[in-house]
Curated annotation (Swiss-Prot):
Its main location: membrane. The keyword Electron transport does not apply. The chain crosses the membrane at residues 13-33, 84-104, 111-131, 219-239. Keywords: Cell membrane, Membrane, Transmembrane, Transmembrane helix. It comes from Ureaplasma parvum serovar 3 (strain ATCC 700970). It is found in: Cell membrane. This is Uncharacterized protein UU183.
Length: 291
């Protein structure tokens, strides 16, 4: 086989491998149920893998509400970083495969392969965007923190009314509550305020609800449908390609019978020739006929 043809074949194989790996990996990450998210007292100061690709860490000083306010960091976790690396490798293999098709000028024979590859590329891009969208950490963690802060301040009997109002001033500013000069009335207004934790969007696939649980968003059903169709199409196509390759290899390995140079294909006898004694009667007849 020509060197360029070998490279072209291997570019096909590598692209198929990366396509299937990315499609399966990103699909799993896109439908993974998020972990518990919020202002978790027992995990303050630790990195918490909340979604499949993102983690957050709350500053431990946020617990000292007398001098500090809420502060937290968001970053990609190991799965998120691995997903970016895998996606870059997939894009490079896709481009390399296109280059090889162009070099050997095999656009027409590779038309079906290109159509399937582009469909898979669009599906992978769709999944990659979904898993890379940053979750709604800000609203969820803030709601959780201020719910905790309000309960702590109202239950702390050592604080004066003025001190409670000073500490809860961040609560008032965050939720845009009216500023009231009377400390007792202001605290009453804060106590009546209800924080909305129902049906908040966490990421494209899940919504966040009170009591720290998640429900499926409408988009996840669209993801199931799109990826299901792509799975079926790619499975049928690649299965047919594998069968075709196996049949081709089988034909090449068939043992053909060697023909004689004169064009005849005579099989050799396995049995040895038997030696037959001459018939006396026939000999007498031949002598009479002078044969």
């Amino acid at each position: 086989m020509d060197k360029k043809a070998k490279i072209y074949t291997w570019s096909h194989i590598i692209l198929i491998v990366f396509s299937l790996v990315c499609l399966h990996w990103f699909f799993i990450l896109s439908i993974t149920i998020p972990n518990q998210t919020g202002f978790l007292i027992n995990r303050v100061g630790q990195w918490i893998n909340s979604s499949s690709t993102y983690a957050y860490k709350i500053d431990p000083r946020s617990l000292f509400y007398l001098n500090y306010t809420l502060n937290f960091n968001i970053a990609l976790n190991a799965s998120g970083i691995a997903s970016i690396v895998l996606f870059i490798c997939y894009i490079l293999t896709f481009i390399f495969n296109l280059i090889m098709i162009g070099i050997i000028r095999s656009w027409r024979p590779s038309l079906l392969h290109l159509i399937i590859a582009i469909l898979i590329w669009l599906a992978i891009l769709y999944l990659f965007i979904i898993i890379m969208i940053k979750p709604n950490f800000n609203q969820i963690i803030n709601n959780s923190y201020y719910t905790w802060l309000k309960n702590v301040i109202f239950n702390d009997q050592t604080l004066t009314l003025n001190k409670k109002n000073v500490i809860l001033n961040t609560y008032i500013n965050h939720y845009h509550l009216p500023i009231i000069n009377d400390p007792q009335v202001a605290l009453l207004d804060i106590s009546k305020h209800q924080i909305n934790n129902e049906n908040l969007t966490f990421n494209p696939s899940y919504n966040y609800n009170a009591n720290l649980y998640f429900t499926k968003a409408k988009l996840i059903y669209c993801t199931y449908t799109i990826i299901g169709i792509i799975f079926i199409i790619s499975f049928i196509y690649y299965l047919s390609e594998i069968i075709k390759r196996c049949l081709l290899v089988n034909d090449n390995w068939k043992i053909k019978q060697h023909e004689r140079k004169d064009g005849l294909n005579i099989k050799k006898r396995k049995n040895k020739q038997e030696i037959v004694a001459p018939d006396p009667i026939l000999e007498e007849i031949f002598k009479e006929l002078d044969l």
